[in-house]
UniProtKB/Swiss-Prot annotation:
Name the record gives this protein: Erythronate-4-phosphate dehydrogenase
Binding site for NAD(+): Q127, V128, D147, T176, D233, G258
Source organism phylogeny: Bacteria, Pseudomonadati, Pseudomonadota, Gammaproteobacteria, Vibrionales
EC number(s) from the headed UniProt entry: 1.1.1.290
Protein's GO biological process: pyridoxine biosynthetic process
PANTHER family: 2-HYDROXYACID DEHYDROGENASE YGL185C-RELATED, 2-HYDROXYACID DEHYDROGENASE-RELATED
Length: 377
């Protein structure tokens, strides 16, 4: 049995080698010839699974993407060909939410505001958006959500119409898939009209898909230099990056918001377990068994936390400025976008750290944010 695995998928080689011969490949440059005599294909979001790619896939029976997003896969085509498909919904929701929170925290420091005084508008209330909503509300931050699909499906949460959310939110963060068709397409959801209507004190974060925001219109909006702030983890034509847009952004990173070690381990184990089920194999893997101990597994609090403490403990685990600085330094080099993804550091989630303090430390909201907590006597 031959299994192609994206070379950027952690723990995949050791897991899938239990099932057959593993062939590691760079996901963005896979060709139809690569899939000749291949039984299974394990990918990430950079691999476009379409008619061209599988045109010579004479043995392919299983495709798994270790990502929550699935818009890079022609699922109807795979179904037509009798090829089983699976994804890893929710695997990276924590990492993406913590990326967005880091952007908020750092901008709060830089611009001199409190996140607790702001309204955060979340567009897209799927796995990521819903998790971010839970975290922010658990911290006592005012949140608005928009998701017409969830609303129409009878989701009991209170949804805000898009135009109202955009007008009422101080921070707008995007967590939608990319779609061009249907009742609620998201391609250029944030277009020239929306961007020109944004106030100078508003912040836009895109950690969803690049084309959700019209990057040319965003560049023109940022050129007004009226205080409007934008942070992008995804770009409309990535891996190509508009080098005129880059200096206008508060933060820019190479599609790594969901690249935390826990999220990648979850994605790998989810599709490994699905493939084992497909093969009627009893092997199973658990992400927690693969992860190393965090560099700083425990932090002690000696008093009730305040916003400064929150800044310190969250940034100790993940500070978006680290990725932003590397991106600006390296992006002009050939192939840099994918190299930064390939060589991404072992970023951890808040859950890798236990906060220890007594009852006066008010640890419960920090648990809502994702930290493990331990109340000392």
């Amino acid at each position: 049995m031959k299994i192609i695995v994206d070379e950027n998928m952690p723990y995949a080689e050791e897991l899938f080698s239990q099932l057959g011969e593993v062939i590691l490949k760079p996901g963005r440059t896979l060709t139809a010839d690569d899939l000749i005599d291949i039984d299974a294909l394990m990918i990430r979001s950079v691999t476009k699974v379409n008619a061209e790619l599988i045109s010579k896939a004479n043995k392919l029976k299983f495709v798994g993407t270790a990502t929550a997003g699935m818009d890079h896969v022609d699922q109807a085509l795979l179904k037509e060909k009798g090829i089983f498909f699976t994804a890893a919904p929710g695997c990276n929701k924590v990492g993406v939410a913590e990326y967005a929170f880091s952007v908020m925290m750092v901008l709060a420091q830089q611009q001199g505001f409190s996140v607790f005084d702001k309204t955060v508008g979340i567009i897209g209330a799927g796995q990521v958006g819903s998790y971010l909503e839970k975290c922010l509300k658990g911290m006592g931050i005012n949140v608005l959500i928009n998701d017409p699909f969830k609303q129409e499906a009878g989701d009991p949460r209170s949804f805000t119409p898009l135009a109202e959310l955009i007008e009422q939110s101080d921070i707008i963060t995007l967590h939608t898939p990319i779609t061009k068709d249907g009742l609620h397409p998201t391609h250029h959801l944030i277009d020239e009209k929306v961007l020109n209507g944004l106030r100078g004190d508003q912040i836009l974060i895109n950690a969803a898909r690049g084309p959700v925001v019209d990057n040319q219109a965003l560049k023109q909006r940022l050129m007004k230099q009226d205080g409007f702030t934008a942070a992008l983890d995804v770009f409309e034509f990535e891996p190509e990056v508009d080098m005129e847009l880059l200096p206008l952004l508060a933060f820019a990173t190479p599609h790594v918001a969901g690249y935390g070690l826990e999220g990648k381990a979850r994605g790998t184990t989810m599709i490994f377990n699905s493939y084992c089920e497909f093969l009627n194999n009893e092997l199973r893997a658990h992400a927690s068994d693969l992860l190393p101990t965090a560099p700083v597994p425990t932090m002690m609090l000696d008093r009730a936390w305040d916003e400064a403490t929150l800044h310190n403990i969250t940034q100790l685990i993940y500070d978006v400025r680290k990725d932003d600085a590397l991106f600006r330094r390296e992006i002009s080099k050939p192939g840099a976008f994918d190299l930064m993804r390939k060589n991404y550091w072992d970023r951890r989630e808040y859950s890798a750290v236990t906060l220890v303090g007594n009852e006066t430390c008010n640890l419960a909201p920090l648990a809502e944010l994702g930290f493990q907590i331990e109340v000392s006597q």
